[in-house]
């Protein structure tokens, strides 16, 4: 332990930290050079004042540098949300990942266990028979053979062990609640990323731009979810060519009907997995349409589709042809053989 972080705690409470100051601060956190009290003091100083893009980018860049990295195919995309929206929906981004992979786009998905629902990405995948507790080499093998891999956050970010207990004791949101989607161990350059607050989508797009992303959609559903909503219009901050464009997106623009929010509310991991299996078998309804909407957006971000309606067509074929279901079966086999 050292006192190197201490001077920056007071500074962080009164003014934004520069990129260099913030990088130094998070180096201290991730190297275990700060006491729990100092870590908590810094995190709450940042939260109370309000984190800046430079601070987000600094934390993400340090976290990326210290992670166990994964090599992914060119053009790989991450489909992920911050969690923390408190809505308890079915596993939309997880299902979307397999539909997109079934359409031929490599998906390097970063995730964790439940944050905003009874069943997070890792919970759902475990229930579907996948082994999520695998390391970088095994994930790389999955990406190369199946075109999809799941990176369980704790398996790739060992430096978080210093911060985890402090986050648990604080019991409130901190900068780390949005760092997951910004710190993909595969370093993908394309993202469909959901945020629990509409106020985060522009800053997160700016952070991804600063970190080298080529194309990304940062989204927040009008139903309060951290994904494109099927029950309301969604807010989008689209990054492309270093420029960020903000707009609202309605399901009908993709040729999809609006459904009541209640129709995508999830349950236990077992219940969500049952709904996921039905979706893969082609069951129509709100869940499938929500996945089609998000998959269409991901396909646009991946340049696999020129527009959302084409994306919906491609995603529908991925489901009805059995391609998405085959990806689940293949990934289950590969992860359990690891």
From Swiss-Prot:
Binding site for Mg(2+) 1: 93, 227
Positions contributing to Mg(2+) 2 binding: 226-227
Pfam name, any one: Glycos_trans_3N
Record-listed anthranilate 1 binding positions: 81, 112
Highest taxon in the source lineage: Bacteria
Binding-site residues for 5-phospho-alpha-D-ribose 1-diphosphate, renumbered to this chain: 81, 84-85, 89, 91-94, 109-117, 121
Cofactor note (record): Binds 2 magnesium ions per monomer.
Record-linked Gene3D superfamilies: Nucleoside phosphorylase/phosphoribosyltransferase catalytic domain, Transferase, Pyrimidine Nucleoside Phosphorylase, Chain C
Protein name: Anthranilate phosphoribosyltransferase
Organism of derivation: Cereibacter sphaeroides (strain ATCC 17029 / ATH 2.4.9) (Rhodobacter sphaeroides)
């Amino acid at each position: 332990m050292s006192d190197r972080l201490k001077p920056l705690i007071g500074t962080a409470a009164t003014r934004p930290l520069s990129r260099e100051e913030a990088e130094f601060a998070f180096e201290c956190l991730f190297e275990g050079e700060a006491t729990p009290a100092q870590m908590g003091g810094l995190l709450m100083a940042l939260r109370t004042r309000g984190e800046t893009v430079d601070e987000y980018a600094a934390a993400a860049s340090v976290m990326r540098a210290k992670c166990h990295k994964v090599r992914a195919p060119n053009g790989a995309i991450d489909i992920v949300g911050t969690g923390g929206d408190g809505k308890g929906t079915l596993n939309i981004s997880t299902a979307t990942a397999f539909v997109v992979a079934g359409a031929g786009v490599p998906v390097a998905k970063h995730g964790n266990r439940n944050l905003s629902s009874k069943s997070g990405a890792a919970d759902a995948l475990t229930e579907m028979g996948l082994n999520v507790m695998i390391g970088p080499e095994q994930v790389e093998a999955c990406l190369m053979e199946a075109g999809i891999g799941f990176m369980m956050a704790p398996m790739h970010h060992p430096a978080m062990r210093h911060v985890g207990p402090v986050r648990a004791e604080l019991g409130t949101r901190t900068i780390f609640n949005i760092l997951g989607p910004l710190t993909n161990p595969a370093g993908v350059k394309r993202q469909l990323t959901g945020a629990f607050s509409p106020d985060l989508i522009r800053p997160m797009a700016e952070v991804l731009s600063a970190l080298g992303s080529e194309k990304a959609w940062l989204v927040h559903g009008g139903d309060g979810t951290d994904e494109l909503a099927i029950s309301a219009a969604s807010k989008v901050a689209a990054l492309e060519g270093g420029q960020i464009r903000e707009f609202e997106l309605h399901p009908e623009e993709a040729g999809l009907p609006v459904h009541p929010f209640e129709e995508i509310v999830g349950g236990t991991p077992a219940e969500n997995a049952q709904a996921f299996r039905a979706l893969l078998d082609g069951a129509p309804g709100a869940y499938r349409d929500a996945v089609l909407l998000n998959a269409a957006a991901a396909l646009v971000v991946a340049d696999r589709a020129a527009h959302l309606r084409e994306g919906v067509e491609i995603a529908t074929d991925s489901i009805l042809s059995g391609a998405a279901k085959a990806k689940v079966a293949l990934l289950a086999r590969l992860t359990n053989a690891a």
